[in-house]
């Protein structure tokens, strides 16, 4: 399983800019498990059309990934 997004070579700069935040090698194993699925999906999305909606989709996916990671880290009340 890759630890960084690996889409096609020609990415719009805004797509590449967001895609970098899906890397997960720096995370501890229990967070890599959560993040890797989002990285895989982000790579698939980035391999599609290069337009503003792709960037929007990746930003929203990034927001979901961040929430999923925080859910694992949640200490409870």
How would you name each of these model-derived features?
Residues 1-49, 64, 73-77:
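Intrinsically disordered, low-complexity regulatory regions
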Residues 69-70:
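Charged, amphipathic alpha-helical regulatory modules used
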Residues 55-62:
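Short, charged, amphipathic alpha-helical segments
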């Amino acid at each position: 399983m890759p630890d960084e997004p690996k889409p096609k070579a020609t990415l719009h700069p805004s797509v590449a800019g967001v895609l970098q935040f899906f890397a997960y090698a720096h995370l501890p194993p229990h967070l890599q498990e959560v993040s890797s699925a989002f990285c895989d999906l982000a790579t698939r999305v980035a391999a599609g059309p290069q337009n503003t909606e792709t960037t929007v989709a990746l930003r929203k996916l990034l927001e979901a990934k961040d929430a999923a990671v925080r859910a694992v880290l949640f200490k409870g009340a």
